[in-house]
């Protein structure tokens, strides 16, 4: 590399490689051999594997209808948020396997997986899902228990006498 002795030489050396303006990252459709988009979603201790394919809007979780797997309406609403936000209610069939955690974490993991799979299937949906916060991994996990404490932060009962 040539020696640079002055500021003018430095500006000449750096001006040769100007960055391209208006560079937009290209998102390509990612499908498997059966025409499905696959993604994994995580929330707390739950990990979900999600496949989406064109269909009638059927959702199957661990080989059960999602109405039977998630009895609480709040969990069903959480799970359907990315589909409703993108107006794809009846366009995709969703198959998910989920393990670990409780029902709330599992619903969040499936929601995260559906969002990622939708972006793999239709990359133009990414800005909508990103704006809604569906693509962001919720990194909050349970705080570990500390020794000398009853729980993570709760102390044992204190007695003066």
UniProtKB/Swiss-Prot annotation:
GO annotations of cellular component type: cytosolic small ribosomal subunit
BP GO annotations: translation
Keywords: Ribonucleoprotein, Ribosomal protein
One Gene Ontology term of the molecular function aspect: RNA binding
PANTHER family reported for this sequence: RIBOSOMAL PROTEIN S9, SMALL RIBOSOMAL SUBUNIT PROTEIN US9M
Family: Belongs to the universal ribosomal protein uS9 family.
NCBIfam families: PRK00132.1 (NF001099)
Entry protein name: Small ribosomal subunit protein uS9
Organism: Bartonella tribocorum (strain CIP 105476 / IBS 506)
